[in-house]
């Protein structure tokens, strides 16, 4: 293994990376509002469902297709179309925009600059999983490691946000993360088996909850 890309991957997935992930629940705040997520157990259940649904069939599959050579502009357009909840779509673009900006300064490459150029020209929007994937691929990170890092970084940021919002204790958050290991490993296996027709096949219940968040009266998060 290359220590160079390993260190770069750790930097890219560190919770201190200023992408704004702390401001997004990606739907779980709606479940808190409805009393469905209220403690360690119920959040862990929601999180594992989120990993097996949206993270696998949307973000994870986008990453795999990118590594397999599918045009980044095509994938960008499909992601914009399939992320039905406005706040979640905007979250992907805001965090993706920050990743593109940070990557351009810290991990510059011709591939990354080409994607940034598409975004500047208005030909692409700049989604988070694609920004991450372009940077990771240009660094020589293998697909499975990139998937594992991206999925677990998302799980970590959501858990940190749940610790504040529910609230949970710090140790409870760590137990949730440990319980998510198998879900992330299973998601990597599932993503490898999916086909193009599966791209964006997310649970309607999750999408509806994400849409409800827009009109929620009291909110801690932007999504």
Curated annotation (Swiss-Prot):
Subcellular location(s) of the protein: Cytoplasm
Purpose of the protein: Required for maturation of urease via the functional incorporation of the urease nickel metallocenter.
Source organism (scientific name): Paenarthrobacter aurescens (strain TC1)
Major localisation: cytoplasm
Lineage: Bacteria, Bacillati, Actinomycetota, Actinomycetes, Micrococcales
Keywords (A to Z) from UniProt: Chaperone, Cytoplasm, Nickel insertion
Name used for this protein in its record: Urease accessory protein UreF
InterPro entries: UreF (IPR002639), UreF_sf (IPR038277)
Family: Belongs to the UreF family.
Cellular compartments per GO CC: cytoplasm
């Amino acid at each position: 293994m290359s220590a160079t890309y390993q260190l770069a991957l750790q930097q890219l997935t560190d919770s201190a990376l200023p992408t704004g992930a702390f401001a997004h629940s990606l739907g779980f705040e709606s479940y808190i509002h409805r009393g469905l997520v209220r403690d360690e157990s119920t959040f862990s259940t929601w999180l594992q469902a989120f990993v097996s649904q949206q993270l696998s069939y949307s973000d994870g599959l986008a990453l795999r297709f990118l590594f397999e050579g599918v045009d980044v502009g095509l994938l960008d357009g499909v992601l914009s179309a399939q992320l039905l909840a406005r706040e979640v779509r905007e979250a992907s673009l805001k965090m993706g925009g920050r990743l593109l900006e940070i990557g351009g300064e810290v991990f510059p490459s011709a591939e990354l600059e080409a994607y940034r150029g598409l975004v500047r020209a208005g030909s692409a929007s700049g989604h988070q999983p694609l920004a991450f994937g372009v940077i990771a691929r240009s660094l020589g990170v293998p697909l499975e490691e990139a998937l594992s890092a991206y999925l677990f970084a998302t799980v970590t940021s959501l858990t940190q946000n749940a610790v504040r919002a529910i609230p949970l204790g710090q140790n409870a958050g760590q137990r949730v993360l440990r319980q998510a290991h198998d879900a992330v490993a299973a998601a990597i296996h599932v993503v490898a088996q999916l086909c193009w027709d599966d791209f964006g096949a997310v649970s309607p219940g999750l999408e509806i909850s994400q849409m409800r968040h827009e009109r929620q009266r009291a909110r801690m998060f932007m999504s």
